[in-house]
């Protein structure tokens, strides 16, 4: 196999790696990049003439919020203008409140009762670092200022200053359902006893990345101040001293939910954990998440290896957890997890899957899945270096 020649930016980018990495890795890199390229929606769409990347070319008829952020992470490496289109599509949907909706469907419907985890600013800042564009940067700053105001005004416990997921459902049942969708972890064990009353560990870490992104896009002491204050609150409030683990916490009664998932490791990814807490999390990883990094601990009584967010392995959340461990020096543990997941991906020739069985590694869910492709690329190319904006590890 040799790379194509011509004017295709994906081909040109892939050619840089041909013969310079293990061939099995090159084949996987090629498959991942072409998955993202192949998911570009064809024909006239509600977002035309912008080119939107669907989560999968097989199902998911629309453009999803946090999927798009992860697509930006991938395609910005070889086609920054295509990456910018993903962000522009979502900016067109932004509500007067500042909320960036969950999805726009191909029939024009917009799901705007809730958002998605705020990873778009992080992806936009990485795009800006890879391919600066002053005009696009101004567009991002205006939209993200409004979006940050939305999260601060509508998704915080005012007295404590931490963030929670929520939604605008007309009934308590709708609000509960839609808040789970806003989290992206639709049916997670984390939410079995409620979600709108929980300070979610991943959300608060994503907001730290939001503030770091704003420091790049919109240099202003305000963003660093908010970042550092949020880090302080995460470390003071979301560390369970009894369990020696980061966990979601009920903002009304102060109780931890006791659920261990890859989200528990997000403070390692953002670098806020002390070395002592990171070491405790490494022990948690060995007991609860190795080798397959399921979406809830193998030891959890509600673990279901085929449950959507109740056991299946998702490459995005597994990457954040494993990269956090890697950045803290737990190389053997992190490398073992990475290699397990990449071997599962390699074992299925021809396509990348939405998620994987955490015991057998068999593929589950949609095929040709975009964010799986994006994180395969990160596992291959951004494993031994610091990911942008994850650089403030506590000493």
Language model segments and positions:
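The tetratricopeptide repeat
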Residues: 120-123, 210, 263, 267, ...
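Extended acidic/polar, glycine-enriched regions
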Residues: 1-8
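Aromatic-rich carbohydrate-recognition surfaces in CAZymes
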Residues: 61-68, 72-87, 92-179, 204, ...
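Generic amphipathic alpha-helical segments used as scaffolds and interaction surfaces in large
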Residues: 19, 74, 218-221
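Extended glycan-interaction surfaces of carbohydrate-active proteins
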Residues: 14-62, 85-110, 159-198, 231-313, ...
